[in-house]
Design a protein with these regions (language model features):
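Short, well-ordered amphipathic alpha-helical segments that serve as non-catalytic structural scaffolds
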Residues: 51-69, 198-213, 244-247, 251
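Secondary-structure boundary elements
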Residues: 67-71, 125-134, 168-171
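A glycine- and small-aliphatic-rich helix-loop capping segment at beta-alpha/alpha-beta transitions
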Residues: 90-102, 126, 153, 280-284
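Claisen-condensing/thiolase-fold acyl-transfer catalytic domains that form or cleave C-C bonds
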Residues: 110-128, 217-285
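Short beta-strand segments
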Residues: 79, 136-141, 264-268
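Condensing-enzyme catalytic core mediating Claisen C-C bond formation in acyl metabolism
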Residues: 1-52, 149-215, 275-285
Length: 285
């Protein structure tokens, strides 16, 4: 049976408290430079108090747990929506030193909840070209925003990191799709379709993909995504970026043991992007 990119491990970790980097005076300089062109005020109270968590501290130990010293990564992609509190060098580069190998390090941000799926698509693309045998995606969110946003934003209740390891597996079938007024096919081709922005069309597309997986499919829906008539696990609110993936980390071992195909779905209404992941396991080992 031919091998294909698959999802071998998903780990999650929550953290409380703060990083000492939240009191670094350079953080104020960094945030002030970022918001100055937009005229946004700083949260001087949070900067003085010291709140938030650095993503390197949050994810480094989880990376070491996910990958052993004899499991080098070829590509590491970090995705986040709420900003890191560590000014200076990109966190993805720092995290690349927390796992075996010398992976190409990339970061992806400002894509809402669609960013996690986009990072996985990029990882799978690297694998399909043969550039990467093992690709790692690191998702992270922390609770502090050190400036006032121009419009209301949803911040997480807790600091959280998720690590997803993608490797080549016999018979595995992992597909990530993203739609926003255009359909992205399994081969990443783009074709014109009707808008997926309405509640009805989003729900219908999720139902269609679930039906294609069969009656025994396990369906995991992100917080806020309603699909009437579909038997699914619904992720509670509170972790807008990592919640869906933390739930996958908790449930995937059981679903794999039951040989069930899996569908994850999330809709970012601000961007109008429907993102889905389907996973069919290979033959029993």
């Amino acid at each position: 049976m031919p091998a294909a990119p698959g999802l071998t491990r998903v780990l999650t970790r929550y953290a409380d408290g703060r990083s000492e980097l939240s009191l670094d005076p350079d953080l104020r300089v960094f945030v002030a430079d970022l918001v100055r062109p937009y005229g946004l005020p700083l949260r001087e109270d949070l900067l003085a108090e010291g709140v938030g968590h650095a993503y390197e501290e949050l994810a480094a130990g989880l990376l070491a747990e996910a990958l052993g010293p004899d499991e080098p990564a070829d590509v590491l992609i970090q995705a986040f929506d709420s900003p890191d509190i560590r000014p200076g060098a990109p966190t993805s580069l720092a995290l690349s030193r927390s796992c075996a190998g010398t992976p190409t390090a990339l970061a992806l941000c400002d894509q809402g909840t669609a960013g996690a799926f986009a990072a996985l698509r990029a990882a799978l693309a690297y694998q399909r070209t043969g550039v990467a045998r093992r690709a790692v995606v690191v998702l992270a969110e922390q609770t502090a925003l050190h400036h006032r946003p121009p419009e209301p934003v949803t911040l997480p209740d807790r600091h959280c990191a998720v690590v997803l390891v993608c490797e080549t597996l016999p018979g595995e079938e992992l597909t990530v799709r993203q739609e926003s007024g255009a359909a992205v096919g399994p081969d990443d081709s783009v074709g014109s379709v009707g808008s997926v922005g309405s509640v009805e069309s989003v729900a219908e597309e999720v139902r269609r993909q679930a039906k294609a997986l069969g009656e025994d499919a396990a369906v995991l829906l992100a917080a806020g995504l309603e699909v009437p008539g579909l038997d699914a696990v619904r992720v509670p609110a509170g972790q807008p970026f990592t919640g869906l993936w933390s739930a996958l980390a908790e449930r995937l071992p059981g679903w794999r043991a039951e040989r069930r195909p899996v569908l994850l779905a999330d809709f970012d209404p601000r961007l109008g992007v429907l993102s889905t992941l389907t996973l069919r396991a290979g033959p029993p080992s």
